[in-house]
């Protein structure tokens, strides 16, 4: 049997397949709120948080999330690892620890060998095990378009967690993975020259757990953090700035990029989701004239299983860096937070 490349079976790859933020915002605004939320919910849907935090008996809390997407690589095992790491990331971004997970599967079982699905599931299971969580089942649907991910339940201290609303003036912004996965995934899907190397780079970073960043949040009691996924670095920073009523300043020259990303963007290669992100955010962004427009595109590139943005008070920066180094986790200092003032944009991109 001739097997198509996994990435050829979907319209968009990874988190770039998300519904555009503006469309999603309009749809969700029509839904009523459950009046019982206040009894149980510590953190809900109001500020576009990465996950929900819900009280349970005994003074404890769980953190709950769900994430799945279409393939961004052709290797099934690697796809399973990336999809699982991406789903687990939401728990880490709140400061929680993954506890158990359920598989979410859509697969054309009559068209593709069963071994492909087995490899996807094996990749996901290995990553869940690496996170210290337990895989306890799942649900599958026969579908022409391959999709895989997890529903993850974590444990968390109901009095110590990070959200989009916790930015404070002076906070230093640390990023724990380089940017460009949306661009590289588009190159892989299109089969561009060198796409095999791009796939390996996507696997290197996408399958990396954000566990070290979660440890920083817990041990230092950080109030603000998020992970960078489908709305891009710019979109997720803007969510934090809006929720916290702050202005976020990014030093674009410090942003880490995956290999070849800048060259690919220069040729015009950018996923549709990235264009949608930039358009949606444009009214709240100020770009210094010396900032390269290609870098602005990358700021809004739709990421899959991206790094954490950690907002660290100045007096805790050294401690945060020490924890990340002890975990052998990469990180970059990319900007800071200021109070909103007259004529100041929510998101400022400076050289």
Swiss-Prot record:
Binding positions for ATP per the UniProt entry = 18, 47-49, 67, 90, 138-140
Q: Does the keyword ATP-binding apply?
A: yes
A single GO molecular function term of this UniProt record: ATP binding
- Which reaction(s) does the protein catalyse, per the Swiss-Prot or TrEMBL entry? hydrogenselenide + ATP + H2O = selenophosphate + AMP + phosphate + 2 H(+)
Enzyme active site:
15
Described function: Synthesizes selenophosphate from selenide and ATP.
- Could you tell me what this protein is called? Selenide, water dikinase
* Source organism (scientific name): Nitratidesulfovibrio vulgaris (strain DP4)
């Amino acid at each position: 049997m001739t097997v198509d490349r996994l990435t050829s079976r979907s319209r968009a790859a990874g988190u770039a397949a998300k519904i555009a933020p503006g469309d999603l915002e309009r749809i969700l605004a029509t839904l009523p709120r459950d009046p019982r939320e206040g009894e149980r919910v510590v953190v809900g849907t109001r500020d576009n948080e990465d996950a929900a935090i819900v009280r349970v008996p005994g003074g404890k809390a769980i953190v709950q999330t769900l994430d799945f997407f279409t393939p961004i690589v052709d290797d099934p095992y690697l796809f399973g690892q990336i999809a699982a790491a991406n789903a687990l990331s939401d728990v880490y971004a709140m400061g929680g620890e993954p506890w158990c997970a359920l598989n979410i599967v859509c697969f054309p079982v009559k068209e593709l060998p069963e071994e492909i699905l087995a490899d996807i599931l094996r990749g996901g299971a290995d990553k869940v095990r690496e996170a210290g969580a337990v895989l306890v089942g799942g649900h599958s649907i026969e579908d022409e378009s391959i999709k895989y991910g997890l529903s993850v339940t974590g444990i968390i201290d109901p009095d110590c967690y990070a959200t989009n609303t916790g930015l404070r003036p002076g906070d230093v912004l640390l990023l724990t993975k380089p940017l460009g996965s949306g661009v590289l995934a588009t190159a892989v899907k299109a089969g561009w020259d060198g796409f095999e190397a791009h796939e390996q780079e996507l696997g290197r970073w996408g399958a990396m757990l954000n566990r070290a960043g979660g440890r920083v949040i817990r041990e230092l009691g950080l109030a603000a953090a998020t992970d960078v996924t489908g709305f891009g670095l710019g979109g997720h920073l803007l969510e934090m700035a809006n929720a916290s009523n702050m202005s976020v300043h990014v030093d674009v020259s410090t942003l880490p990029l995956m290999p070849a990303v800048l060259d690919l963007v220069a040729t015009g290669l950018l996923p549709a989701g990235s264009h949608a992100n930039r358009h949606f955010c444009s009214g709240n962004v100020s770009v210094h004239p010396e900032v390269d427009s290609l870098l602005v595109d990358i700021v809004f590139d739709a990421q899959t299983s991206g790094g954490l943005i950690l907002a660290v008070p100045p007096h805790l920066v050294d401690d945060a860096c020490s924890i990340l180094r002890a975990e052998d986790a990469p990180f970059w200092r990319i900007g800071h937070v200021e109070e909103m003032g007259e004529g100041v944009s929510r998101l400022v991109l400076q050289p």
